[in-house]
Amino acid sequence: MDQSFDQPWPTSLAEARAIQQHIRTRIITHDAHGPIRTVAGVDTGYSGDSALAAVVVLAFPSLEVLDYAVARRQIDFPYVPGYLSFREAPAVLDALASLRIAPDLLICDGHGLAHPRRCGIASHLGVLTDLPSIGCAKSLLVGTHEPPPDVRGAWTPLHDQGEVVGAALRTRPGVRPVYVSIGHRVALETAIRFVMACVTRYRLPETTRAADALASHGRIPR
């Protein structure tokens, strides 16, 4: 991508909380995107005191791998639940800036609005890059939900403090749901459709599988 995302990062929880609260006011929760022809999976792994971010761009809807990038950054922010984007986003932004093909949509291995301050990494990255983004997480961070029916594509709302903050989505019968939430510029039901369009034989969408394999093992599954 012909773009740099350099910016100051917080040095305290108070600064980080203020940044999240500011970003929250800029999140667009309705569909505000053009045609989606490329979709990128985003994931981050750890090695010692550094974060290794991987971004894999796939054609949509064919899911052919078109481009990928990795970036390593030293972690300068402590591990605190709810603030992981400050550990991971700097490396992810470096990887995004290295891409030759700009994605039309980000699907992040993490949460968006389904977050204590409604600003998980999917929303954080979406607002900073102004790219449409979706959170698709393997585990729950906040909220409660009824079990979705054991049918591919079935989902139930994820509630937290009186709000619908996401969805528990059954991507395949007989497997645990994933947790989909708005990141930026994509409505919830649209986000669910995009995630399901990226699911093939596995519980996780191909975007997540590709980025996770690249971050963890240095290769993309075929």
Swiss-Prot record:
Keywords: Cytoplasm, DNA damage, DNA repair, Endonuclease, Hydrolase, Magnesium, Metal-binding, Nuclease. Its main location: cytoplasm. It comes from the Bacteria. It is found in: Cytoplasm. InterPro entries: Endonuclease-V. It catalyses: Endonucleolytic cleavage at apurinic or apyrimidinic sites to products with a 5'-phosphate. Mg(2+) binds at residues 43, 109. The record marks 79 as: Interaction with target DNA. GO terms for cellular component: cytoplasm. One of its GO terms (biological process) is DNA repair. Its EC number is 3.1.21.7. CDD domains: Endonuclease_V (cd06559). GO terms for molecular function: deoxyribonuclease V activity; magnesium ion binding; RNA endonuclease activity, producing 5'-phosphomonoesters; single-stranded RNA binding. Gene3D superfamilies: archaeoglobus fulgidus dsm 4304 superfamily. Its cofactor is Mg(2+). DNA repair enzyme involved in the repair of deaminated bases. Selectively cleaves double-stranded DNA at the second phosphodiester bond 3' to a deoxyinosine leaving behind the intact lesion on the nicked DNA. HAMAP family: Endonuclease_5. Belongs to the endonuclease V family. PANTHER family: ENDONUCLEASE V. This is Endonuclease V. It comes from Roseiflexus sp. (strain RS-1).
